[in-house]
Amino acid sequence: MLLDNLVISVEAVAPMFIVMAVGVFVRRKGFINEQEVKRVNRMIFLVLFPALMFNNLYGKELSDAFNPRLAAFAVGMLAAIYIATVVFVLKVEKSQKSRGAMIQAIYRSNFVIMGIPIVSNIFGSENLAMTSVMITIIVPIFNVLAVVTLEIFRGGRPSPLHVIAGILKNPMIIGAVLGMLAVALNIKLPDFAENTVGMLANAATPMALLILGASFNINSVERVKRNLIICLTGRLIAVPAIALTCGVLAGFRGVALVTLVAIFASPTAVSSFTMAQQMDSDGELAGACVIFSSMFSCLTMFGWIFALKSFGLF
């Protein structure tokens, strides 16, 4: 079982690293230059991520496997962690742009990519309904908080109206709102439209990983080393330690507890890099957080899964 848990963690993140490595190769071979990387990244932000947000919500029936107690706990814990992260980062970092990237890197996990593989590998694909429903609840909150955070910490002192306008015009927010409207109004798109949105949504994560690899510069790590260590410690150790301890004390077990592992112990969300770069935050720090948190999460997620399994909690 020890080896099985390690394999689960590695298999969940290995494809991400392979695609990022392809991005590094593409850039090194000169197939794409720095300006093209930025243009493609903007296309991902404006076209692919909104399609992904819409597709994550469109056609979903939230009531089938909805666990109100788990949802309330996860949302409440996320709110508490977000507030604590903001307070902490404001104390340890003075740069506005770095603040936004750090807050996002610590609170915002890669739940979409990590959640399904982890639960499926431990409990089987027949037990994915609860996790899938939680994705439709937690991921939009992740994204709204990210837009709010990066808009506020763009630099200077923006007016509240400017911040609100930036949030409302954000492509990911627009995609999420359209998805929620489609669910609320029971709108059924024609098959060709569903297929088109689905294709764009499916391209979002691999393209983001490819461009992340293409934009990665090992020399930039030295500049962001201090903040990178802070973010990795928060994302992979502090946040899961607090959230999972509270989850165990609250009585969550089995699929519900492993879903909390996926929410709070996963590495930093891939889309945080694209958003940071496109919203004038510290893109180098955000990219480094995605890469290194994904790397170290093979060990830390294995540790959390093994510890919970050893205590017979699932």
Give the predicted meaning of each segment.
Residues M1-F314:
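Alpha-helical transmembrane segments of multi-pass small-molecule/ion transporters
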